[in-house]
Amino acid sequence: MDDVAIRDMTGSQSVDRATKLLSLVGRQADGMTLSAVVEKSGLNKPTVRRLLLALIRAGLLEQDDRDRRYYIGEEAYVLGTLASGRHGLLRLSTESLHRLAQKTSDSCFLSVRRGASSVCLHREEGSFPIRTHALQAGSVHPLGVGAGSLAMLSALPDEEVSAVLEQNAAVLENQFPMLAPDELRRRVELTRIQGYAVNPGLILANSWGVGVAIRYPDGGVAGAVSIAAIDSRMQEPRQSELAVLLRQETSRIEIKLAEQFRDRRTRHIAAVARPLKRRSPR
């Protein structure tokens, strides 16, 4: 391997490691200490320090002068805001989440898939005084763990479900032994039959959830909306009633997604046609 190829490989590895640290710190609302970043990343301390300093220089991370913890930076917020115009599922879902929280008085969530994991993007609080704290904005779980997460897993093709479960086998065994791959396969089938996912207090005792997947116009999984409450508020017939409300709101979100993609396609066609029109003879 020549020197150029070695330099390219080293540079690519540094980028991969830096983005891993950015994602790791960015998902912790309370920030992270240097020792915590070292422990969670599996990298040595000098490498972590060097990469964190590079991310700080870019504005993607910042370090608080008082507690010396690392937090997501302003530039990451700017980039996220710009990306929301193209990947604006939260913007398209805000009204539905607010409406669900008002109608049910329970906490409502929007989650998206990231590889073999699910990430909670938003938590909308309801007015019911007793709340469940199983899921917060920024929470990451293996795909299939939690109602919204299970709804997304169940919406995938069988071969993709198998690939996800294989990838998550170790973490499921270590952190969620009650949800072994075979048990999740069973729950995927049940979710497909009834049309919505249920978490009967498996992650946090007495904290139940119901979730429904959101699909792109082509049928792919865009995310999921879910509702969580204490177990006494999740029994039948209310469980089925919540599922109906979730289906109504996910349908509204899917219509908005379809309109967004249609508008984007129209603008693209118009942009391509303009130079062709200028070249046409008069």
Task: For the regions a language model picked out, list residue spans one by one.
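Amphipathic alpha-helical effector-binding/dimerization core
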Residues: D67-Q167
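Short, solvent-exposed recognition segments
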Residues: P129-I203, R278, R282
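Short, structured helix-loop boundary elements
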Residues: G11-V15, R69, G73, R86, ...
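Extended hydrophobic
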Residues: P177-R252, E259, I269
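Amphipathic alpha-helical regulatory segments at dimerization interfaces
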Residues: L24, K40, R91-K103, F109, ...
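N-terminal helix-turn-helix
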Residues: M1-R86, L90-R91, S251, I255-E259, ...
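Signal-transducing coiled-coil/dimerization helices and immediately adjacent hinge/linker segments
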Residues: R262-R282
